[in-house]
Amino acid sequence: MKRVLAIILGGGAGTRLYPLTKLRAKPAVPLAGKYRLIDIPVSNCINSEITKIYVLTQFNSASLNRHLSRTYNFTGFNDEFVEVLAAQQTAENPSWFQGTADAVRQYLWLMEEWDVDEYLILSGDHLYRMDYREYIQRHRETKADITLSVVPIDEKRASSFGLMKIDDNARVVDFSEKPKGEALRQMQVDTSILGLSPDQARKNPYIASMGIYIFNREVLGKLLRQNPEQTDFGKEIIPGAKTDYNLQAYLYKGYWEDIGTIEAFYESNLALTQQPQPPFSFYDEKAPIYTRPRYLPPTKVLNCTITESMISEGCILKDCRIHHSVLGIRSRVESDCTIEDSMLMGADYYESSTKRKAVLEAGKVPQGIGAGTTIRRAIIDKNARIGRNVLIINKDRIEEAEREDEGFLIRSGIVVVIKNATIPDGTVI
């Protein structure tokens, strides 16, 4: 795998994940209590023996930069690296990244300095575990110019993805990016060609691109230079290449979830608590997911009732009830609290006992979840200060709300408390 260079696309402004992307790049959004989204593709690369990795970003990349430099520091005299490439303006390219393909085009000069055969292009906001060695092996065996990783998908979600038709040799013969209406129905295929059972094929009559591509080095360079007006892989580069190049589809059979929206992000995190076996597990010794070592103390649990939940290290929990929830590092929950169906991202630092006492005496709200508070179906971003006897339960069953000046938003019925926000004592949301 030394002949492969990985390129992870950090995505755009992350508007669908706002406000989680208000102060951070999309790949830096916390996941499962202690990880970040970027840890998934980087870990998959490392476990697949791919250690030349670029991450392309444009928005709020400071925390992502910090996380990657502290986590994936390959030392020694070798060619292993994980490096962030932020959008920049040059004499040749006076504008920012205009799309996924344009982002790669603007740094193609740097990527071509590496003596590799293939470029593996990945997305920074997917949850899955994949051995890219098998994927690359299939690409080489079929003598493909481009190979797309694909999954069968149902009609409900199909219009959110690039869809394709393939022949008996898994060659892509038609491709349409996020089709709607009649164009969507025309992309229906018999997915039993992928080896699905008749019942599975009926439920999933579409073949969707995962947004994961392998390009031969010369092919990518040629496509990007010959089509400077084309800025997106899914909308322009891939559909335009299907006639002149050998495009192959590679079926991925494991769990895969695009977590680019608040609802998908929320559901994917809480699914990790599923019993007896969650759809995705971080407990895999053969293919671990890596993240920054923080050297935090064990979580302190004082007379709590905790069911179907994941509690990260360094938390302090007192006389509370936690059900079907994920608690991030350094989470603090005071007595008589109830946390249900929620994700608490925790904190970046501890507030000392002396500081907490001074904050309370000043009539302000200390970090963490105050006594007597109830939180249901919510995402609480890092360093939030939730007062005493607060109800975050979406009392009026509102689907969408913009209350950023009050420290929260509602997306798909999920209350999202913004990073560093303060919710005063007695507030009812």
Swiss-Prot record:
Keyword set includes Protein biosynthesis: no
A Pfam match: LbH_GLGC
Organism: Gloeothece citriformis (strain PCC 7424) (Cyanothece sp. (strain PCC 7424))
Enzyme Commission no: 2.7.7.27
The organism's taxonomic lineage, starting at the top: Bacteria, Bacillati, Cyanobacteriota, Cyanophyceae, Oscillatoriophycideae
GO MF terms, alphabetically ordered: ATP binding; glucose-1-phosphate adenylyltransferase activity; structural constituent of carboxysome shell
Residues bound to alpha-D-glucose 1-phosphate: G162, E177, K178, S209
Matches recorded under HAMAP family: GlgC
This protein's pathway: Glycan biosynthesis; glycogen biosynthesis
Official protein name in the record: Glucose-1-phosphate adenylyltransferase
